[in-house]
Each structure stands twice: as C-alpha cells, then as structure tokens.
Regions:
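Glycan-processing catalytic domains of CAZymes
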Residues: 1-207
Length: 207
C-alpha cells in the first residue's frame, strides 16, 4: 500500500487550499493562515497535499510557495503543473517540474489527468515513461473513472474491467486511483462500491 514510500498509508483529498486563499490587507499572501489550514489537515491524518480543485493559477511559482509551507509541517505534495483537464503535458513542462519542484523533499509527483478515456492511455503512457526516465523517484498521478461510468461516452472501453486492464497495460503509474461517490448522506453505501474496490485490488495485486 505504501507506493510513495511514506512509511504509512497515503491519505489525501481532492479540492485544495490554494496558496492565495488568505491575504493581508495590502493584498500580499498570508502564509501563516495557509500554513495553519494545512497543519489542520495534517493533524486530521492527511499526509499528501493534492494541488487541484478550484485553482485559478497552477503556476510553478505558486506551487513552490506551497511546497515551502508543506516542508515546514512535514506533508508531501502532488502538484499539477499542467492541470488535469487539458492536453497531455509537454516535455518542456517535465523540465520545469524537474528544475523547480522535484528538488523539494515534499514533492512526490504531478497530477496530469482526471478521468481519462481509454483513447488517451497511449499518450499518457508515453508521458509517464518520459517522466519516470527523467525523475525515477517521482510519479505521475492519474485519477480514473469509477465502475458506474458510461462505457461508450466516458470509459471508451467495452466495459470497466477492460478499461482497468488497458490502463495497467499502457500506463505505468505507481498507484491506481479512481473516484467513487459511494457513501450516501443517508448512511448507505451504493451497491457496486465494494465490487469496484475488489476488482481494482485484484488487478493491481497481479501487477
């Protein structure tokens, strides 16, 4: 389970607290308030900050600012230099990550895509291979669809099992991530939640 070498189970979130969420009266960043919010996350058991969500500026400069805060409180960081709903990142973006973000002790890798279809797996796989070639100790984070996604319009695969098989075959990330909205407000759990979990677990154990 410890795919990132943390010495503990990796726990993160989706939407983030951006470095510019808190400002002083003159408009400058209030890093102490930002640090306090991330300290609360760490105290709750979260050990990886995921830089995604309602972010209006994913610049390298902003991410370096947040990395400095995370280094102070002992959290790790998965950035998003390219964003997760755009074209596959370029070689130039890998170079920027390697130069400016990867040297940080808090940096784990880069989030490049949320819920890709299978038609994107070849390109994503090539990007992951190049990322690992340049930074073998870092990783690319990709979040997949859940089992209830539409096969034709979302998965672009015949079925969910084939979708997972195709991803594992073509994209060599350290972790296989997917989202599943399974815990309902009334306390129930949707009927395929554990089926999805069991399928992904069995597939990844075979790798």
């Amino acid at each position: 389970y410890d795919v990132y070498g943390l010495g503990e189970f990796p726990i993160s979130y989706w939407y983030t607290v951006e470095p510019w969420s808190y400002t002083n009266a003159d408009g400058s960043y209030n890093d102490e308030l930002t640090k306090a919010r991330y300290q609360e996350m760490k105290d709750s058991g979260i050990n990886i900050a995921m830089y995604y969500g309602h972010a209006i500026n994913r610049s390298i400069t902003e991410q370096k600012r947040l990395l400095g805060i995370l280094e102070q409180i002992g959290m790790k960081f998965i950035g998003s230099a390219s964003g997760a709903h755009v074209e596959i990142p370029t070689a130039e973006q890998i170079a920027e990550i390697k130069e400016h973000l990867a040297p940080s002790s808090a940096y784990l890798g880069d989030l490049v895509r949320d819920e890709p279809g299978a038609h994107e797996f070849d390109g994503l796989g090539a990007y992951v291979d190049e990322f690992h070639r340049q930074m073998p100790d870092k990783d690319v984070y990709i979040n997949l669809f859940p089992a209830y996604a539409n096969a034709a319009t979302q998965l672009k695969s015949a079925n969910y099992e084939e979708h997972i098989d195709q991803y594992i075959e073509k994209v060599d990330t350290k972790a296989l991530s997917y989202d599943y909205y399974g815990l309902m407000a009334n306390g129930s759990v949707t009927n395929t939640y554990y089926t999805n979990l069991d399928l992904v677990r069995s597939k990844t154990l075979d790798v």
